[in-house]
Amino acid sequence: MARAFPLERVRNIGIAAHIDAGKTTCTERILFYSGVVHKMGEVHDGAAVTDWMAQERERGITITAAAISTTWNDHRINIIDTPGHVDFTIEVERSMRVLDGVIAVFCAVGGVQPQSETVWRQADRYSVPRMVFVNKMDRTGADFLKVHGQIKNRLKANAIPIQLPIGAEGDLSGIIDLVKNKAFIYKDDLGKEIEETEIPDHMKEIAAEWRSKLMECVAETDEELIEVFLETEELSEAQLASGIREGVLNHGLVPLLCGSAFKNKGVQLLLDAVVDYLPAPVDVPPIQGLLPNGKEAVRPSDDNAPFSALAFKVMSDPYGKLTFVRMYSGVLEKGSYVLNSTKNEKERISRLIILKADDREEVDALRAGDLGAVLGLKNTTTGDTLCTTDDPIVLETLYIPEPVISVAVEPKTKGDMEKLSKALLSLAEEDPTFRVSTDPETSQTVIAGMGELHLEILVDRMLREFKVEANIGAPQVSYRETIRASSKGEGKFARQTGGKGQYGHVVIEMEPGEPGSGFEFVNKIVGGIVPKEYIKPAESGMRETCESGVIAGYPLIDVKVTMVDGSYHDVDSSEMAFKIAGSMAFKDGVKKCNPVLLEPMMKVEVEIPEDFLGAIIGDLSSRRGQVEGQSIDDGLSKVQSKVPLAEMFGYATQLRSMTQGRGIFSMEFSHYEEVPRNVAEAIISKNQGNS
């Protein structure tokens, strides 16, 4: 079967933003105008096509990244609608990894919010070209140019308007296209009747001013254009359009568009801009990966190149397990066998699907540049590479943040234990930031995730999808341990119990590692004073002790261990003896290296009416918070702070009562920081008391 759209006419885009900026509504309107749906769905009515989980429709928020295909101006557009709530950061992260371009949606009233910064950083991490849609221009207090200023200042982006709104708030009647130098006036409520006309007299001056700024900005991204601009102080429409496209592809320019998705204004022009300015798979650098020999290689976006794809999401489905894939090169055919090169296991491709939210279209093949789903993969999880068995490669994988909160969970009835295990396993397969473990002390099942809402939604899904009712314990913070000094550690395990004894002896040097290094082991044993076959068991004993902690039972991070000495016995030494000796040496070293407890610090932004500012700052300080900045805008105060996660449980309820329901806050993980001594002592003694 031939390709339906040439690669140059394919766009893989994401729609990402802060919660409530209106991105799901934008997606709905795109589907309406491009003919995928024939009736508009509203988020607040629970009828949005891309919000397909029951909880999404109830809560009016998008939790999972829904992938949808549509067409516009003879181009195939694959869209991923991502969640804006910080607890679902992994959904944004995994969609950024597989996209070629992003529409960042900002609210014309709220502007740049904390989660917008997170999404922007994620797009930066994967170097995704982007443009901005300033939505909700119909709302009271909408200010397009104020949002432009915030994007330049807070996100440090070279943002430039390519449109201007005609009117604002209730009087939004049309949009000026600065590239075409024309006005588009909306004649009906559905936004289907649009009249292209001259720019209204009262806006000619401001349009000329911003068009001149646009030309200057575009000219600066290209040497040929700057020469033309310096000579004539003018660029043609074609020069402007190609200059904007070049600027977007090279990350030198972020075009700003405006409109109101809810009022059906600006969406068709946004689709035109997606086609005109965002990259096709062939416009972005080819995907990099590692060959079996460890050398780097690339896979070009080409149907004739060896097949390679990245699994970026796994979902349970009534028909089986759905694995979403981004095709990078080659062709994937139904019925074929492929290699999961991450796990070195073969997989059979039973069915291939292109998604249109709740609707699905079965296809015989997926081609380079496609976003689709495979039904029936047995061993593939998020971040795995699928490729041809003849030409294996492992592609760059996803960045997966560590969970920061955990709770104990148990079924309400003992008979549901097996159902609970199945449900947790299935949910953990779908979501790599959701971890399931068993507490070795209490034998309780512990689930960990990115925040209270994240775990709440997952428990809710257990009830709805797996019919398991569960009791949830109080939230627990994921502390970490580390060391602040260097020292030696020694472990000698000698046991004689008649017959063959046990003997292992390990000496190590321990020092703080680089931030983010985890556990690093170096072997400096020379001259065979400890035989090679005992080094690995000794390291294994240290690694296991590192994972279970020394002072309070939390994983130890950023520690470097060098094995420098030891001794063995010809008869009595064994792998197990050296594993125990390694663990003993590690514990001995940690105790001499000034061990400390670390806690997750959260970046908290609170938005409240000005009258409550004093009370809120006082409350944050009482939670061991450090206020880092504040601003007042239109009677609303924004307070930025860093607060320990341990002090933030139940904050939503407290904030509501302190501000009579008028305060809102957002919270995301920032970094780990040392726990004050008095707090650490209480945590350590509590944990030692439990053990």
UniProtKB/Swiss-Prot annotation:
Q: Which residues bind GTP?
A: 17-24, 81-85, 135-138
Molecular-function annotations in GO: GTP binding; GTPase activity; translation elongation factor activity
List, alphabetically, the InterPro entries matched.
EFG_II, EFG_III, EFG_III/V, EFG_IV, EFG_V, EFG_V-like, EFTu-like_2, G_TR_CS
- Keyword Ligase on entry: no
Q: Where is the tr-type G domain?
A: 8-282
Which PROSITE patterns does UniProt cross-reference here? G_TR_1, G_TR_2
Ordered alphabetically, the record's keywords are: Cytoplasm, Elongation factor, GTP-binding, Nucleotide-binding, Protein biosynthesis
Q: Which GO terms describe its cellular component?
A: cytoplasm
One Pfam entry name:
EFG_IV
Where is the major localization of this protein? cytoplasm
Q: Which GO terms describe its biological process?
A: ribosome disassembly
Q: Which SUPFAM superfamilies match?
A: EF-G C-terminal domain-like, P-loop containing nucleoside triphosphate hydrolases, Ribosomal protein S5 domain 2-like, Translation proteins
The source's superkingdom equals Bacteria
Where it sits in the cell: the answer is: Cytoplasm
Query: What is the stated purpose of this protein?
Result: Catalyzes the GTP-dependent ribosomal translocation step during translation elongation. During this step, the ribosome changes from the pre-translocational (PRE) to the post-translocational (POST) state as the newly formed A-site-bound peptidyl-tRNA and P-site-bound deacylated tRNA move to the P and E sites, respectively. Catalyzes the coordinated movement of the two tRNA molecules, the mRNA and conformational changes in the ribosome.
By sequence similarity, the record places it as follows:
Belongs to the TRAFAC class translation factor GTPase superfamily. Classic translation factor GTPase family. EF-G/EF-2 subfamily.
What NCBIfam families does the annotation carry? EF-G (TIGR00484), PRK12740.1-3 (NF009379), PRK12740.1-5 (NF009381), PRK13351.1-1 (NF009891), small_GTP (TIGR00231)
- Protein name as it appears in the record: Elongation factor G
Q: Which gene encodes it?
A: fusA
